[in-house]
Amino acid sequence: MDAETECCKCHLLDLPWEDVLVTHIFCYLPLRQLVRLQRVSKQFYALIQVYLANCRTFDLTQIGPSLPKEAFCNILRDNKVLQNLSVQNCSDWVTDTELLPVIGQNQHLLRVDMRGCDRLTRHSLVAVSLSCTHLQYLGLAHCEWVDSLSIRSLADHCGGLRSIDLTACRQLKDEAICYLSKKCLKMRSLSVAVNANITDVSVEEVAKNCRELEQLDLTGCLRVRNDSIRTVAEYCPKLQSLKVNHCHNVTESSLDPLRKRNVEIDVEPPLQRALVLLQDVVGFAPFINLQI
């Protein structure tokens, strides 16, 4: 009986690698655990390399910020089928040297997140533009190296872009945003927050060209006024969210029509703000010295 049981034993590595382990098992395990599994044996190392070569998503938030650049390059060395790439957690060390080879051999990327990667240059963005023509989402928040020329390249080659985060990309001016909106007509989500260069000119152009727009973030765009918000209300019937906090020239007269359409706005109506202030004053009332 023991001999028969021994013959019937099936070890993990005996299962078909690509058809079973890679496709139906490893896809449910965190990347951190899979990387650790490589250390068990040479066979496990080879197996995990097969998995990594067929991985559709690479997100470093699953591993942590401590991944060395050598490990990053090794993990993605053989992968040519990535669809989602996030290097946000590599911001301390990732440069064009590490990223360009990955971009160059993965032409099916749909989502790329480079937020906060301040050691990259425009060469990485141009590479994304030229290689990833089916790109739908791009995160570039706090990448101050993003300039007008690289955005033009993106607009020319990635017309199907649905969402882009340009928060604090302070080199960009109205001209670049206008050009982007004319080329990427399917845009549904756009952030140009924390950029004092943005004015009504580009906001109105976005509204008129991107009729499918659902989310617009103008936080801290100090030169944006009521006129462009009215244009957004007129041309963007699918708008769901508008952020205008710290836009001091945007008032309730332009926001009220959007509120009536149940658009989520991050600024409270004047009455609500007054009630909050009143509650604060009442809260301090016991401490007020009435003899003053």
UniProtKB/Swiss-Prot annotation:
Residues 12-59 form the F-box domain. Keywords: Cytoplasm, Leucine-rich repeat, Repeat, Ubl conjugation pathway. Pathway: Protein modification; protein ubiquitination. Its main location: cytoplasm. It comes from the Eukaryota. InterPro entries: F-box-like_dom_sf, F-box_dom, F-box_LRR-repeat, Leu-rich_rpt_Cys-con_subtyp, LRR_dom_sf. It is found in: Cytoplasm. PANTHER family: F-BOX AND LEUCINE RICH REPEAT PROTEIN 15, MITOCHONDRIAL ATP SYNTHASE COUPLING FACTOR B. Substrate recognition component of a SCF (SKP1-CUL1-F-box protein) E3 ubiquitin-protein ligase complex which mediates the ubiquitination and subsequent proteasomal degradation of target proteins. Acts as a positive regulator of the BMP signaling pathway. Required for dorsal/ventral pattern formation. Belongs to the FBXL15 family. This is F-box/LRR-repeat protein 15.
